[in-house]
Amino acid sequence: MGAQIRVYRQKIASTSSMRKIFKAMELIATSRITKARERVSASLPYANAITRAVSAVSSQHDIDHVLTTEPENPTRAAVLIMSSDRGLAGAYSANVLRKAEQLLTRLGEEGKDVDVYVVGRKAQTYFDFRGRGYKKLWTGQTDAPVAERAAEIGEVLVDAFLTDTADGGVDEIHVVFTEFVSLVKQNPHVVRLLPLEVVEEEAATAEDVLPLYEYEPDAEEVLDALLPKYIESRIFNAMLQSAASELANRQRAMKSAGDNATSLIKDYTLLMNNARQAEITQELTELIAGADALNNS
């Protein structure tokens, strides 16, 4: 019986240590979420403005530009998948990978060859385990992205988009990331970056009315200059939203783990007390039985 009590004490001690770790990770994630949300909010005005500028140039001028031209028969697509480097974030990476698989299946059914670009070690492990290749991998800083990484990814994707499909280029670029809605809601999301879906002036609502610009030297050169900046800004915004979503998921996962640890400690404590009570009862029973035996003798 004493050995059983020692086992329960060891379990209580180890679970208590784990609970402290979970609590520390929860507090770290909580403290970083605020900054991550602020970065998402700060990136939105620029991303929206450059998208509107590109739409304005394209809708107000009859320009046959690779940025907005829909290929007649697209045969190749690039898919950028944003996951996390670390675990302990609930179903965050699993959800975005499930969304990516749905997109890959749809593109395959449309007869398109797909080049996969991967961000985060979780997605890397997912594809490596299944023996499925990917075009390029980026790891590190998934929970604290930097603009330089977005520019690097954007440069690779733009080069692929501007390259002829016969030479390994692509006709479309899609991004799969986690959209940060609130601390309790994050949605896996798919966005087609290129070709850009332009809002035509006739179809624009009062809120979507596009501004009029004059371009020097001409609108086509403006689009050439905007293409890499547009891609970079959209990718960076997606990375920031993914980072905020990862931290929110980790905070919830660590809180849940801490609550479960507390529940386990209560259960082990109850079992230990029951075992101690049974041990005391057994000892008393043996003492009484021994005393009775002495008296009867």
UniProtKB/Swiss-Prot annotation:
It comes from the Bacteria. Disulfide bonds: none annotated. Pfam families: ATP-synt. GO terms for molecular function: ATP binding; proton-transporting ATP synthase activity, rotational mechanism. PROSITE patterns: ATPASE_GAMMA (PS00153). GO terms for cellular component: plasma membrane; proton-transporting ATP synthase complex. It is found in: Cell membrane. Its main location: membrane. The keyword Cell membrane applies. Keywords: ATP synthesis, Cell membrane, CF(1), Hydrogen ion transport, Ion transport, Membrane, Transport. GO terms for biological process: proton motive force-driven plasma membrane ATP synthesis. It is a peripheral membrane protein. Signal peptide: none annotated. Produces ATP from ADP in the presence of a proton gradient across the membrane. The gamma chain is believed to be important in regulating ATPase activity and the flow of protons through the CF(0) complex. F-type ATPases have 2 components, CF(1) - the catalytic core - and CF(0) - the membrane proton channel. CF(1) has five subunits: alpha(3), beta(3), gamma(1), delta(1), epsilon(1). CF(0) has three main subunits: a, b and c. Belongs to the ATPase gamma chain family. This is ATP synthase gamma chain. The gene is atpG.
